[in-house]
Each structure stands twice: as structure tokens, then as C-alpha cells.
Amino acid sequence: MKLFAIYLGGRAIKCNTELHDVVFSCGNKIEDTYKDLLDKWFGLPDRLHIDSWVELKYVDGFEVVLSNDKPISKNKLFFINLGGYDKNKFEELHESRFFVGKDDKNIKLRAKHSLLVGFDQVHTDDIYDVDDCIEIKEVSGLYVNLIKSNKKENLEFNNGYLPIPNQVIKSFKKSIL
């Protein structure tokens, strides 16, 4: 079983532009997460799609392992989403990254020194402690365990429009009626 971070896109009632959210889900392949993504999406199911996804296999010198056992390590997996502005653009810009650390204070400091360097008015938007804020237990009853690793492996981002198949959406909509 693999842990995925998924950047969702879609629409909600009364919105003028595409909306986004980042969620975490488990499966053997990304397609296994589709129903869970629909459960977690706040907007219109018919417009939900994946804009980016990544398997969280190695992060910050740690191997990410899903297990039935509660973690014994004090290290935690964090997702940081930092926002900032460029005076020449009409938008808030974001940069996101995954970190491992013992507490969010240290992680916030690391993020502020490595994300959106050189941008105006940088601020922290969302910080998630995956173990505490995202209930991994509810996605197949598995816990995130972090094992120190010497293996250096970059995350492989899968970027591009990936729609949730219509038959999955239809089945989901029937299940919630």
C-alpha cells in the first residue's frame, strides 16, 4: 500500500474559477484512490480531477512506510503550503513541499528559508502534520511510519490533467443518495 499526496482541481457552486485542494490517500496505484478523493472533495463531483499527484516514498531522508503499527519515531511527516506575492502578477503564488521533523516550529522555519525565496509578503497558509491532521487510519487502517534511510530518491511528481472516470463519479453519486 502506498501513500499519495494528490493536488485536486474542480469547481464548486458559485465559484468563478477552478478551485484546488491537497489531500492524502492510500492505494496500490493512483486509480485506487478515486472514491476516496470524491469523499474528500468539497465541490461538484462531476468537475473533480487530479492536477498533480506523488507517491510519498522517501521524504527528507526518511522512508515512508504504511503499517498496521503505530509509529515509534518522534519524527512526523509535514506538508507545507507557503503563499506569497509578486508585484507584477494578479494572483497569490504558492509553493508546497514535504518535510520530516519532530515539531512544526522547526519545519516552519525550514520552509520559510527554502520556499518562495525572493517573493513579496511570504506567509504560511497551510501546515499539516499528516499523522495528526490527516486521518490516515481511516484509509485502510494504516499508520505512517518514518524510517531513517540513506537512500536519496527525489519525489516523482505526476503533473497533468487526470479526470476521475465518469463511471466512478456515477457510482459515487448513487452511493450518497
Model regions and ranges:
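A cross-kingdom feature marking solvent-exposed beta-strand/loop segments within repeated
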Residues: 11-25, 45, 90-98, 117
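The feature marks the first
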Residues: 1-35
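Generic "edge-of-domain/loop-turn" microfeature
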Residues: 13-15, 30-32, 60, 87, ...
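A short, charged, amphipathic alpha-helix used as a generic interaction element across diverse proteins
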Residues: 29-44, 104-118
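A structural feature that tracks compact, well-ordered secondary-structure segments
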Residues: 8, 22-23, 27-28, 82-83, ...
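A cross-kingdom feature marking charged/low-complexity
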Residues: 1-3, 7-8, 54-90, 117-118, ...
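Conserved short beta-strand edge segments in small beta-sheet-based binding/regulatory domains
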Residues: 46-54, 120-128
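Short edge beta-strand segments in beta-sheet-rich domains
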Residues: 20, 94, 122-131
